[in-house]
Curated annotation (Swiss-Prot):
The modification N6-carboxylysine is found at K192. It catalyses: 2 (2R)-3-phosphoglycerate + 2 H(+) = D-ribulose 1,5-bisphosphate + CO2 + H2O; D-ribulose 1,5-bisphosphate + O2 = 2-phosphoglycolate + (2R)-3-phosphoglycerate + 2 H(+). It comes from Rhodopseudomonas palustris (strain BisB18). It comes from the Bacteria. InterPro entries: RuBisCO (IPR033966), RuBisCo_large_chain_AS (IPR020878), RuBisCO_lsu_C (IPR000685), RuBisCO_lsu_C_sf (IPR036376), RuBisCO_lsu_fd_N (IPR017443), RuBisCO_lsu_N_sf (IPR036422), RuBisCO_lsuII (IPR020871). Homodimer. The lineage of its organism: Bacteria, Pseudomonadati, Pseudomonadota, Alphaproteobacteria, Hyphomicrobiales. The basic functional RuBisCO is composed of a large chain homodimer in a 'head-to-tail' conformation. In contrast to form I RuBisCO, the form II RuBisCO are composed solely of large subunits. This is Ribulose bisphosphate carboxylase. The record marks K330 as: Transition state stabilizer.
Amino acid sequence: MDQSNRYANLNLTEKDLIAGGRHVLCAYIMKPKAGFGNFLQTAAHFAAESSTGTNVEVSTTDDFTRGVDALVYEIDEAKQLMKIAYPIDLFDRNIIDGRAMIASFLTLTIGNNQGMGDVEYAKMYDFYVPPAYLKLFDGPSTTIKDLWRVLGRPVVDGGFIVGTIIKPKLGLRPQPFANACYDFWLGGDFIKNDEPQGNQVFAPFKETVRLVNDAMRRAQDKTGQPKLFSFNITADDHHEMVARGEYILETFADNADHIAFLVDGYVAGPAAVTTARRRFPKQYLHYHRAGHGAVTSPQAKRGYTAFVLSKMARLQGASGIHTGTMGFGKMEGEAADRAMAYMITEDSADGPYFHQEWLGMNPTTPIISGGMNALRMPGFFKNLGHSNLIMTAGGGAFGHIDGGAAGAKSLRQAEQCWKEGADPVAFAKEHREFARAFESFPHDADALYPNWRGQLGLAAA
């Protein structure tokens, strides 16, 4: 059935839709399946399925219903581009406080339309949120400024937070885990649970929390510097998440503001993120995106992009989210990922298709991880243009030839190298931990700095 007369209006302009302030706009790359309707007909069916329609006309439809139809307002068949305007009144609101929910946004914009028989594939690349709808989202309650404050740094341009993930990701018992934390904290700032770490039978949660608390206090006494830890509180059950969070805060007591809560936001979903955001508004909310590649990977033709995921995370209230390494690490990514970093940190930013004003909503910190080490960091900072972020290097710290503390120091020295605009190999001659990173990661050293062996001489022997 051709629904383009009802669910498409190509006379609408994006400028007028934005000025009207009553529509969420979404940009998709879509390909119709052969043997069905043309591009516009398929796009209109997509809009119908995403809002008020189905595959047939129904007798219960009235004029009001038609007034909240989603509408295709722009297509470019050559680029497989379609843009759809969704009236904000379509989206569900909480009955307790009238707030918006990402679950409803996803259900409409990327829900049943992903399984339509006449669509070969469709993937969301960007979306725009008007002020009236934006104001209904929680947004972050804490930011990197809160972490900088704990660390005793300026709250403007407080700089690089040197972090790690304790490796191996699974298999360490509580005491060896805490020992690794102590070792890293002698040189670094921030440690996070890896996403599967929790309450394994060989590493009971409460015992691990107590020992990490002890390790943090000893490291702070030894270095005279505050330390940070991000605990995984992800669970299927809301009550389990709250129980974990409350136990952690009770245990760390006067160091409670040194604690972030990590939530596996993709696998556990918006409900888990909102549970952490609302029950623990004073804690830094660390959004881990494990599993997201199933839909965000460039190889995936359905779903949505990592850019879209990150933008949704800011709306939900994530204080920080993993944003990849812009092609400088081991995970999929590209230099264009910096647009994602700007979208979640700035108050006014351009996406692939839409400009977004955030109206003062708190920013979300880019958290960088995935195959990073000190040798890759100067180029990463140069591409991004600043170092106001958290970086969690697992192998990049504990793979250092002199151990976790030296690995942490090498990462901090990498930021110093970039800030000074120094040649990394020349810089290494005066900074032992950074120099030893060349020996620790020789494959990267050969690829990035081909003549390093001769230039460093005995330092690289």
